[in-house]
Every structure is written in C-alpha cells, then in structure tokens.
From Swiss-Prot:
Cell inner membrane keyword on record: no
Protein name according to UniProt: 2-methyl-6-phytyl-1,4-hydroquinone methyltransferase, chloroplastic
MF term (GO), any: 2-methyl-6-geranylgeranyl-1,4-benzoquinol methyltransferase activity
Region (SAM motif III): 207-220
C-alpha cells in the first residue's frame, strides 16, 4: 500500500488493563485509542490504572499490497444489493451475536456524545436498525433518520416497534440526500466496508454535519494473520487504523480519535480483524462543505454485471463471510475452555 496513504498519523497509544469508567471498558484487554500527533494523551487519573505504550507506525507492504481504493466483492453496490438480500434474513440473529453485540454497540456509541434527546441524528448504512436501537436510548426516535441502500435490510428496521417514529429512507452513503449543515450527529456502523470510495463517504459525513457536529464511524480493522487477510481482501474493505485517521483528517475533521472494540471473549481483534473492530470520531470545525475536493464518482452503477462474474465473486464472498462467521464461534468456544486472561 502506498506510503502516501499512511502519513496522516504517526503515533498509536495502546491501553491495556482497565480504562476510565466513562469509557465503560471495564477490564478490557484490547482497548485502545488513536489521537492526532498534536494532541496530548489524557492525564492520569484515579480511574486510569493502565500502562501506555507509544509506538511509531511505519509504512509497510508486509500486510497487504492491495490499495484500499481497489474494490472488493461487496464494495460493488450492485453485488452488495444481492448479497444483502439474502444476508438480511439472518443478519440480526447470526451475524450480530459474534461481531456486533449490544454491549459493543453501546461502548462504540459513547464517543458520539449523544447527550441531547432533541439533536438530529443520521444513521448512515443503518440496515436492520440494530445500531439505531442504541441511538434512540439517548435521542428521540422522531429526530433520527435511518439510511441504507438495501430495501431488504430496511424492511427489518421498519418491523422493529421502537423504530416506528424514525425516518427510514433508501440512499447512498457517498451521495447523501441531506442538505449541508443538517445534522448534529452522523453515525455509521458496519457500512464503510461496502463503500467503493470511503474517502467520498467520509467527506459526505463532514458536509451534512452542523458546525461542532460529530461523526462516529464504526467499522472493521485490517487483520495481520495471513489467512484472515486473504479472506478480508476477497470479501470487503477492512481499513487499517491509519487509513481511518487519514480519511477523517483529509475530509476536514478535527479532534479525530479511534478506539478498538470487540466482544469481551474475543481474542485477536488485530490478528484476525473484526467486522466491528473500531470506533472513529471527528468534530466538524467550520460550517459548510468539506475543504476536500474530489473528482466524479468512479463506480458506474448502471453498468450491468456479467452473470458468471457475479456468480464467481458471490461464491468467493460467501466463502469469506462464512470464515468471518466461524472465527467468532471459534473464539467463543476457546474462551469457554480457556477464559480470557488464563494462560493457554
């Protein structure tokens, strides 16, 4: 991967042990936070009993030479549409329990500062509404808009009684149907991995937020284990942590921060990756559009996909998704035999 993509941040602070109570990461072993180089780490407090390690990240080709801009299987909107037509049937009952639990959701949403029931919130890529259920704990449902490109996923959201007052619309995360300076909060969980152009989607997040508004993007992290890397590259976009930071910075966000998340029993968020592996936030410092100028969209959604090509890619994607369903099951069984914290 080109070094120019990784120059946005040069320090990573890893925190092990217990973290501040306000983060509600009680006893987590794999929590972490990114901060921009110009920011200082939070001062030690009575509640912070942790060891901090600062390392300098280096541009490397050892993880993968495949650029983030090269689309994987379900970074193609047409193919993702059909993929989710089937996945929506089992998404809440099979996918979420291993990758996106209620505890994870609530922890990941905390940095979004959903502290006012009257604030306007857009949930981009909201799908079945699982993340939205966490949002409406803090915000009046009538002030929340769920947007997704999959009508099949949105049908599941519409069927959820607590979401009846939410506005639910079909739309494109890279071309949002909201005016500039519209929302107080932008939330997107488990969606960036399907965007053909992640930078464009994050630029849109900046545009639709009001001055001082905050974006909270929750997504996967790129694995280090070779087999997990292979399936990640086949299936969908698993960004590196440095890439998240750079995308936010380029879009114009300030106070960009990243923290790792994962089920309490999951070992190896960085080794195997995780569909919901980190939460990234940034604040909009000025009104108006993003300072980042981009050319026209590259993806041609009108161009038909050859049936045989689609079938081949669909089968590869299905195999990769099966792998990422089985990894959490393996981790859960492993934790039952050797609880986390015990030597193997």
């Amino acid at each position: 991967m080109a070094c120019s993509m990784l120059n946005g941040v040069d320090k990573l602070a890893l925190i092990s042990g217990k973290t501040p109570n306000r983060l509600r990461f009680s006893g987590s072993d794999f929590t972490g936070s990114y901060k921009l180089p110009r920011l200082n780490l939070p001062p030690n407090s009575r509640n912070l009993r942790a060891k901090t390690l600062t390392t300098v990240t280096k541009c490397t080709l050892s993880a993968s030479e495949r650029p983030a801009s090269q689309p994987r299987f379900i970074q193609n909107k047409q193919e993702a549409f059909w993929f989710y037509r089937f996945l929506s049937i089992v998404y809440d009952n099979i996918i979420n329990p291993g990758h996106w639990t209620e505890d994870m959701r609530d922890v990941a949403l905390e940095p979004a500062d959903l502290n006012n029931r009257n604030m306007l919130v857009v949930d981009v890529g909201g799908g079945t509404g699982f993340t939205t259920l966490g949002i409406i704990k803090h915000v009046d449902p009538k002030n929340v808009t769920i947007l997704d490109q999959s009508p099949h996923q949105l049908a599941k959201a519409k069927a959820k009684k607590p979401l009846k007052e939410c506005r639910i619309i079909e739309g494109d995360a890279e071309d949002l149907p909201f005016p500039t300076d519209y929302a107080d909060r932008y939330v997107s969980a488990g969606s960036i991995e399907y965007w053909p152009d992640p930078q464009r989607g994050i630029r849109e997040a900046y545009r639709v937020l009001k001055l001082g508004g905050k974006a909270c993007l929750i997504g996967p992290v790129y694995p280090t284990f070779w087999l997990s890397r292979f399936f990640a590259d086949v299936w969908m976009l698993f960004p590196k942590e440095e890439e998240y930071i750079e995308w936010f910075q380029k879009a114009g966000f300030k106070d960009v921060q990243l923290k790792r998340i994962g089920p309490k029993w999951y070992r190896g968020v960085r080794r195997h990756g995780l569909i919901m592996g980190c939460s990234v936030t940034g604040v909009k410092p000025a009104s108006g559009d993003s300072p980042l100028q981009l050319g026209p969209k590259v993806e041609d959604v009108q161009k038909p996909v050859h049936p045989l090509v689609f079938l081949y890619r669909f089968l590869l994607g299905a195999l990769a998704s099966t792998y990422y369903v089985l990894v959490p099951i393996y981790m859960w069984i492993k934790d039952k035999i050797f609880p986390k914290g015990m030597p193997l």
